[in-house]
Amino acid sequence: MLAALALAQSYSFAVIGHTRGGPGNGTLPMERYDELVREVQRAAPNFVVLTGDLVYGDFEAKSVDRAAVEKDWDAVDAVFARFGCPVHRVPGNHDVWERTTLELWTSRYGALQKSFEHEGSQFLLLNSCWLPEAGSDAQCPPRFIRGVQLDAERRAFVERELAAAEEARHVFVFLGHVLWWDEDAAWWSEVHPLLEQANTRAVFSGDLGPWKFSHVERDGIDYVQSSVEFTVPPVEMRRNREAVRMLSEQLDNFALVRVDGDEVRIEIRTLGALESGRFTPATFRDVHEYDAGSFERKVWNRMDTPQKLVGWLWKLGLGAALGGALIGAVLTWILRRRA
């Protein structure tokens, strides 16, 4: 009997975030999906949790093309069905960002926040997306694309579910955004204390930014950001924007969590290291050394931090001011001599 119970409480699940294509509807990275499916099938989890940004969602369009977005949902759901196991979802800001996309989500997948039990553990699926007011045509403001802190209603859901699952052996939490990134984030004072009181083992998010992967441990809870970037930004963006380079130069990844009784082990699996062709010396040169030897690059190499740049600007400004003052003094002296 004990052996059977121990066997029943040994299971695994995968956590995968930001699998969307784009930009634009209908742009689906099928080659990368095929690799993802192979890796998930190889890991053979009992179920998968998808942590948001699963379709492009006609993001920022003035009027959402409902048929196009629904077609993309059909396409990605067909991919996810190939995992060969149950799939659970939380929304990202591309999935739900105005009234039409919200209606599509709820009609296909039900409530934005859910929980379920598996082998004595409790799993909380949370919504971290901005939502329009009922009947409003408003769209997600740019300042909220990284999510919103959980309001009183969403926190009440967490409290109820944790209270109902106080006997759970483990608690795992999933959401679309990295709401704990900043040290002064409301998450740490409003949500983390609730999770700390339960048997919470890990919290997972799937959004990009500032990295694809990050991890912090606090009070015995692992906070894991794990995501993929199947649509590579143009080379000009990678050359010109440090934030884009930091993302694109991390490997795509997903989490595989193995639970064996009281033991929880989180493994990070990578995607595209060999298959994508993105991590070659030629790619590095194309992004980082395309202007090697140029005057601009030589100047940049001398001032490769903001502090150095500001220091040089101060020196140049001070030099210009002193030079101007000296020229002014000389001209004044000459004019007085002639007077």
Question: Where do the model's predicted regions map?
Answer:
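Extended active-site neighborhood of metal-dependent phosphoesterases/phosphodiesterases
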Residues: E60-H170, E190-A202, P210-D260, V264
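Sec-dependent N-terminal signal peptides of Gram-negative exported proteins
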Residues: M1-L7, V330
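A short C-terminal boundary segment appended to hydrolase-like catalytic domains
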Residues: R245-A339
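Active-site glycine-centered loops adjacent to acidic/histidine catalytic or metal-binding residues
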Residues: H18, G52-D53, G92-N93, G176, ...
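A mature extracytoplasmic/lumenal domain signature
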Residues: G17-R20, N127-W130, H177, S227, ...
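N-terminal active-site segment of His-dependent metallophosphoesterases
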Residues: L5-A67, R160, W181
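Mobile, glycine- and charge-enriched loop segments
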Residues: Q9-G26, M30, L150, R154-A185, ...
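Residue-level marker for buried hydrophobic side chains located in beta-strands
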Residues: F13-V15, V48-L50, R89, V173, ...
